[in-house]
Design a protein with these regions (language model features):
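A solvent-exposed interaction/effector surface
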Residues: 1-107
């Protein structure tokens, strides 16, 4: 079962090679009536699945950034890390699965 939690790393931070989380989020199924939450912006995202422990996440981020550049896109926002499997769902740290998404636009 997937977990409804994730983290956000600010653009100015991950572009400098720092991948520490700036804030966390919880996924919700449908829009709420109050304004006490923030929605992930709609749009085109470059995405990669990172399998492994957190200390190797930079390898996947670098692959994704290289791919985005190679395909003629540029990053335009913060990076989202959505934890599909982590210490709550896997006893093997090398089986952690994190979806990394970065909003992009064509150059």
């Amino acid at each position: 079962e997937e977990l409804p939690i994730g983290s956000i790393v600010y653009k100015n931070q991950y572009l400098k090679g720092s991948y520490n989380e700036n804030c966390y989020y919880v996924r919700i199924e449908k829009k709420r009536k109050d304004d006490n939450y923030w929605l992930k912006p709609k749009g085109l995202y470059g995405t990669i699945l990172h399998e492994g422990f957190y200390d190797t996440i930079h390898e996947s981020v670098c692959k994704l950034l290289d791919f985005i550049e190679k395909e003629g896109y540029q990053v335009i926002g913060d990076m989202y890390e959505y934890e599909i499997h982590n210490h709550f769902t896997s006893q093997d740290i090398y089986k952690y699965l994190i979806q990394i998404s970065i909003p992009v636009e064509k150059r």
